[in-house]
Amino acid sequence: MRHILTIILFSFFSFTVLAANFNTTGWKTYLSYNNTNSVEESNDQVFVVAEGSLYTYGKDDNSIKQYYKGNGLNDNTISLIRYNKQTKSLLIIYDNSNIDILEGGVATNLPYLSTSTSIRDKQINSVLVHDEYAYLSTAFGIVVVNMAKKEIKDTYKLSLNITSCAIQNGNIYMPLQPIKQKYLRGLYTPH
């Protein structure tokens, strides 16, 4: 009888200890740190995308902070990030072409491209950050994002697959695909 009572008490206290360590506040998220595919750096932290998830590494205190849909981002599966030193904000592009701008730990959503019904192929090929703007080279043309105002400034539907763009000497250059060694040039007027 004494052994049975000891076993019951031991079991009771074991379950009590396990219950004390159980997370009752909700889900715990484990993000992958493998297969890093995008890294951007600010003055005080490094932004990293690994397997579609975003985290930051604090340079001063070696801290790691995770960002995901459950704690402030507006979508899942990040495909690309770009940091704008002028606006001190991070442009986040998701696989479905949804866009967030992260500034001071707060994400502002720009769903224009992902929710547009007039654009069929919404693939974002690359991003150029210049001044306070981000130029998104897409399967249909160029989308200009004003990162300071957190808004879509312009959309240029060129019916061309623009893989990248560059700004030099007051002009914006865009290579044409599939024609090699041909490019489209336009006058660069940011305002």
Q: Which ranges hold each PLM region?
A:
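Loop/turn residues immediately N-terminal
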Residues: 52-55, 95-99, 140-143, 171, ...
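Conserved beta-propeller blade signature
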Residues: 45-48, 55, 89-92, 133-136, ...
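Short loop/turn segments that connect beta-strands within beta-propeller blades
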Residues: 58-62, 103-106, 146-150, 187-190
